[in-house]
Amino acid sequence: MKYKAHDYQQYATDFIIGHPVSCLILDMGLGKTVITLTALWLLLFDYFEVRRILVIAPKRVAETTWPAEIKKWEHLYGMTFAVAMGTAGQRKEALLSGADVTIIGRDNVSWMTKNIFFDFDMVVIDELSSFKSPKAQRFKDLKKVRPMAKRVVGLTGTLGNLMDLWAEIGILDMGQRLGRYIGGYRDRFFLPDKRNREIIFSYKPREGAEEKIYELISDISISMKAVDYLDMPECISNRVTVSMSESEQVLYDRMADEMILEYGEGQDIDAVNAAALSNKLQQMANGAVYDESGNVRNIHDRKLDALEDLIESANGKPLLIAYWFKHDRERILKRFPARDINTKKDIEDWNEGKIPVALIHPASAGHGLNLQEGGSTIVWFSLTWSLELYQQLNARLYRQGQKHTVIIEHLVTEGTVDEDILRAIEKKDTTQNAMIEAVKARIGGMTDDGRSNDEGI
């Protein structure tokens, strides 16, 4: 296929070429893979600046998206690639193949650094949030070999929170902008927030810290949002509210108030902390909950009833249903002839319109999956606190190439934690927009623009 770059794509490609260290914050659907591959081809065969390139990506993206994109575009002809997946022997063979581009799953980074001589002069990290934790082994191991690469590119749809930025940017620039040690970064830009006499549980940014941090990374960062650059179809977000019966609501409220719900047959459902409580309340809002013995206790079918109405009204139009808990999936499958989206074959069948009702878990539907050809309606049966997973799944349908209006349906149980989750997602999105604007690239009339003090770059 011939590649005709949009202005923003050419700008982003030129940015990679012009910056040995670069961070591209590109909204879903903008084509960050082909943008990056175009820059890699030019650096390999026009500028002769690099010899071997390592691409680190989530497993499914490494297996399917990057190889497919290299094969897809005519202008990338001549670029050889190898996929370092499978058994240790297969991974080793790919890494030693001498291919121009070697693609490896992020979960194999530590294995690679321990078993293979690092012989890459450029590294591409897709998705940058994979390295947001300085305590993660993959971060520590990649950090050891990072100085051997003279060029590095970080790709992400969204930057992490301010504390995460230290690791995400540090793995790119080796601590030049935000400091070499997490303790120094924390002391410089943050103040203790929630704490008791001995333990600090969380930190909050100092006044003006946010603007200063974005200013420090602005020279290597560009950010683009799809709505600014693409002729996208309309996206409509709906809320389908369901209500529990009085007795069901009493059970829900009692657990919220008392943290422990006496639930029949002597089984206690114990939420010992806020996270566990939220988890239990989410399950109950969906209609079932695991007790302490791991058994599923049904509470209501309100969301299943609402889902039945949506399936009926779709009249054969494909629906992509997002679930979170295993019992959500089991209850949906028991009631409807749905099919999971897990394998390459599942994705192909979905895009060919062969799956009227599809099930997908947000954590397995992240970066790089193209599902826009198979449907345009997402139903969030289970909501998620993760803004990143929420946006990533929505962007599987609401992206370049989508020809129809995208409908996002949220099943919300009235008077439950579901309402809190939707509010949190909206609040996080507002904060994220502020962060993105601080480093946003402007084209045509716009400027170019756990704790340990010993963790270091």
Model-found features: residue ranges?
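Conserved Helicase C-terminal RecA-like lobe
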Residues: 1, 18, 30-31, 35-45, ...
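Conserved pre-motif I regulatory segment
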Residues: 1-25
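Conserved Walker A/P-loop ATP-binding site and its immediately adjacent core
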Residues: 35, 50-72, 160-164, 324-325
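Conserved P-loop NTPase motor "coupling/switch" region that bridges the ATPase
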Residues: 52, 78, 97, 122, ...
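Conserved helix-turn-beta segment of the N-terminal RecA-like "Helicase ATP-binding" lobe
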Residues: 61-86, 172-175
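Conserved helix/coil segment N-terminal to the catalytic DExD/H
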Residues: 88-120
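Conserved RecA-like P-loop NTPase helicase motor core
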Residues: 105, 329, 337-424, 428
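Non-catalytic, charged low-complexity extensions flanking SF2 helicase motor domains
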Residues: 405-407, 411-457
